[in-house]
A protein has these predicted regions:
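Class I Rossmann-like S-adenosyl-L-methionine
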Residues: 1-316
């Protein structure tokens, strides 16, 4: 599922695009934002389908060996541990995943040579050799080898990343978040549960998360000039032109959360935007943003403009 932080990042990216368009229709910007979120889930399904594809390739390799004109003893009696891996079998037969793959018409047939190279490299790894030849693996061991395959051979493969980026430029910043979703999916699978378990939903709380995305985008966009003025008033000894555009936008989004999103504590808002700045802005941004937001928050509280609702939120 998409974390609140990733949702904020997606809103930030959508607001940048909206600003670059000269402030086109708000509805168009919001539609593009929702599309970018849907595409994150598409990437999640594509990543899971890759694991299934490697499994299918491994099974086909065994069948090809058996059908050789002069098969070896190894060809006729292959080690089946990997292809019979319980997690892989659960993913392969997962009706929910199969439905998603079919709906998106995902097909890796054009990239079988890349799949072959990836699987060949994986088979040479110390972990794979130990898995195939060591003690009989339990379900935990079976999960662990799939983590190895996914994290070290699929997720970080530059050729695969290029393929994904060609499919959608929107995916460029989503690999880490989606990778975590895939790992959590496998981590939550159970040996004795049909098909392992359910796939991760797109949202933790669909109603609340969609409302956050919608309100944060709309309120930040429509109050852009007001928030700009509020921030400028706090830029003592700072030249406005020296303020990074990312810092300015993150502070506007934080202001929007302070004032308009009643269910999120102000401390959470502060921490989230400071953390986002560490990844998307300058090394000094976290200190700068923290200082400006501290001043703005104190002023807003004094003016009675912070209205937080819910258990443990009043006064935060």
């Amino acid at each position: 599922m998409l974390s609140r932080r990733h949702l904020r990042v997606k809103v930030m990216q959508a607001l940048f695009a909206y600003q670059r368009s000269g402030g086109a229709e708000l509805a168009i910007g919001e539609k593009l934002l929702n599309h970018s979120l849907t595409r994150v889930y598409d990437l999640y399904i594509h990543q899971l389908s890759l694991i299934v594809e490697v499994h299918s390739f491994a099974k086909q390799q065994i069948e090809d060996g058996k059908n050789k004109r002069m098969p070896t003893e190894h060809d006729l009696n292959p080690n089946m541990r990997f292809v019979e891996n319980r997690v892989l079998v659960q993913l392969e037969n997962h009706p929910q995943l199969e439905k998603h793959i079919s709906a998106r018409k995902i097909n890796w047939s054009e990239h079988l040579e890349l799949i072959r190279r990836i699987f060949t490299a994986f088979k040479e790894s110390e972990e794979y050799v130990e898995y195939m030849n060591g003690d009989e693996p339990n379900y935990k061991d079976q999960r662990r080898i799939i983590y190895k395959l996914y994290e070290d051979y699929l997720l970080v493969n530059e050729h695969l990343q290029s393929i994904f980026e060609e499919k959608s430029m929107l995916w460029m910043n989503d690999f880490e978040q989606v990778g975590e979703m895939v790992v959590r999916t496998i981590s939550d699978f159970k040996k004795d549960v049909d098909f392992g378990g359910t796939l991760k939903p797109m949202y933790k709380d669909e109603e609340e998360d969609k409302a956050l995305v919608r309100d944060l985008f709309r309120k930040t966009a429509t109050n852009n000039l007001e928030y700009q003025k509020m921030i400028e008033e706090k830029l003592v000894n700072w030249d406005l032109e020296r303020v990074a555009s990312t810092d300015m936008l993150l502070m506007k989004m934080a202001l929007s959360e302070f004032i308009n999103i009643s269910s999120i504590p102000t401390k959470v808002t502060m921490n989230e935007y400071i953390e986002i700045s560490k990844e998307y802005s300058t090394p000094k941004s976290k200190v700068f943003i923290n200082g400006i937001l501290d001043k703005l928050l104190a002023e807003l509280k004094e003016q009675g403009k912070i209205k937080k609702m819910g258990k443990g939120l009043i006064g935060n």
